[in-house]
């Protein structure tokens, strides 16, 4: 799979609650970054198992559907820049999430080396019921 296909596949895995499958798309030394994470939250996770420790609770706390996936063309098949929308529901709070994302993926040999995810953390905080509830997902607490 090229980087665009991997990004689309990764979104489907998250929609299906398969956080382990999502993490398995990463190279063992892959990196997940959230440049706009709120102060005090980690912005970088290095290594597939560290990413899994961060993402493992995602399906328990949030269901999401992604739509309007668009890509910005690049000359490199191992680089994808995607823009998409996500609508979700926080399982515990019942809060609704409407979020727009921009994700940059760098891949090699069908694995994610870098997934840089840009999103508005305030929308997640609102949907999840505040800072403490959001920390359970975002920080893997």
Swiss-Prot record:
Disulphide bonds in the chain: none
SUPFAM superfamilies in alphabetical order: NTF2-like
Protein origin, superkingdom: Bacteria
InterPro entries (UniProt xref): NTF2-like_dom_sf (IPR032710), SnoaL-like (IPR037401)
Family affiliation: Belongs to the PhzA/PhzB family.
Protein name per its UniProtKB record: Uncharacterized PhzA/B-like protein PA3332
Taxonomic source organism: Pseudomonas aeruginosa (strain ATCC 15692 / DSM 22644 / CIP 104116 / JCM 14847 / LMG 12228 / 1C / PRS 101 / PAO1)
